[in-house]
């Protein structure tokens, strides 16, 4: 019983750490999950390609929850591989959870029978169980699972808005890593007033302004430099720290994003030029 699926990375419009309301959008690079189920096996094991020491508790929990709910509690093995750097603010955990849940449903033969948003909720529950998220990250999960841009209330796992956005994007990932579960939530809560304003902007469809206000606020709250965002502003529709960092994402038209990428390439780390993604997670 084998299944395989991919799910995209995502960037941030609104970080949910301040109020529980968040917004994110899918980016066109993926993580892939391959799941092999064994009916006679009770446990689940996992590995992450090129990261032998990485914690696989999240993806193992995804398999277990999916087989408990939609199968007969089968055990097995899950392997993830892909282009999304770990602990970089690009929603690698949400993408891995989405891909793993879909791959497990594929292995069970029910991938087309389960609504995508319910599959995303299953991955969010696994993330909470595994302790890799503060807010549940339903915004990140829905953006990656459904594609496009989503605005969510993570306190209720409620999808408020889904919209399709057609942007070019530049992604700068510095060499350091930051784990969202380690973020200083109390400092983030101090920018709740700005976060409410960002949510209003996003709900009104002013995504670029929302993203930029979020970026400046959460750079301050999480102690990241604003210089990369300020450098990008003349060329971008919107720019923000992504998640809890350290990556920054700028969106806009092709020429503007090429200018941003050129500027960001002067910094250490890696710069990727990509686009938004509208189809979300899918079996392969």
Residues of each region from the PLM?
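ATP-binding N-lobe of GHMP and related small-molecule kinases
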Residues: 1-85, 277-284
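FAD-binding core of FAD-dependent oxidoreductases
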Residues: 12, 18, 87-97, 127, ...
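Short beta-strand-to-loop capping motifs
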Residues: 37, 174, 250-254
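Short glycine/serine- and small hydrophobic-enriched flexible loop segments
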Residues: 64, 101-109, 200, 216
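DPxDG-like acidic metal-binding loop motif
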Residues: 90-118, 145-147
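Alpha/beta catalytic cores of group-transfer enzymes, especially the acyltransferase/condensing modules
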Residues: 117-159
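Acyltransferase
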Residues: 163-225, 233
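Glycine-rich, charge-dense phosphate/pyrophosphate-binding loop(s)
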Residues: 204-284
